[in-house]
């Protein structure tokens, strides 16, 4: 396993730990999710380039599309919660109230 793969795996793990530990604010959760998606994108792109898989070359672009959709939905939810409640705490996201 090369050093770049280890760094990307470590970035993914740190983002996952950040998502699990700092769940009080919604903005920090969204940033951790974006870090996870970015590290997955880099790992997937490097794997496809190193193995010369031409059939799977669209997978990183599809992952970027899903990451953009996740970011747009997360930011719209953040704006809705912060304008409604005045803060971005995750405790405000009760499914019975939405």
From Swiss-Prot:
It catalyses: a ubiquinone + NADH + 5 H(+)(in) = a ubiquinol + NAD(+) + 4 H(+)(out). It is a multi-pass membrane protein. The chain crosses the membrane at residues 1-21, 29-49, 61-81. It holds the Pfam family Oxidored_q2. GO terms for cellular component: mitochondrial inner membrane; respiratory chain complex I. The keyword Protease does not apply. Its EC number is 7.1.1.2. Its main location: mitochondrion. GO terms for molecular function: NADH dehydrogenase (ubiquinone) activity. The keyword Transport applies. Disulfide bonds: none annotated. It is found in: Mitochondrion inner membrane. GO terms for biological process: ATP synthesis coupled electron transport. InterPro entries: NADH_UbQ_OxRdtase_chain4L/K, NUOK/Mnh_C1-like. Keywords: Electron transport, Membrane, Mitochondrion, Mitochondrion inner membrane, NAD, Respiratory chain, Translocase, Transmembrane, Transmembrane helix, Transport, Ubiquinone. PANTHER family: NADH-UBIQUINONE OXIDOREDUCTASE CHAIN 4L (PTHR11434:SF0), NADH-UBIQUINONE OXIDOREDUCTASE SUBUNIT ND4L (PTHR11434). Core subunit of respiratory chain NADH dehydrogenase (Complex I) which is composed of 45 different subunits. Belongs to the complex I subunit 4L family. Core subunit of the mitochondrial membrane respiratory chain NADH dehydrogenase (Complex I) which catalyzes electron transfer from NADH through the respiratory chain, using ubiquinone as an electron acceptor. Part of the enzyme membrane arm which is embedded in the lipid bilayer and involved in proton translocation. This is NADH-ubiquinone oxidoreductase chain 4L. It comes from Stenoderma rufum (Red fruit bat).
């Amino acid at each position: 396993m090369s050093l770049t793969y280890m760094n990307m795996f470590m970035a993914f793990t740190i983002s996952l730990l950040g998502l699990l530990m700092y769940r009080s604010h919604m903005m920090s959760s969204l940033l951790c999710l974006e870090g996870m998606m970015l590290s997955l994108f880099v790992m997937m792109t490097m794997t496809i380039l190193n193995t010369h898989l031409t059939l799977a070359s669209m997978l990183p672009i599809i992952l970027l599309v899903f990451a953009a959709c996740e970011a747009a939905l997360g930011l719209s939810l953040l704006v809705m919660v912060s304008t409604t409640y005045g803060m971005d705490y995750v405790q405000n996201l009760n499914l019975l109230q939405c």
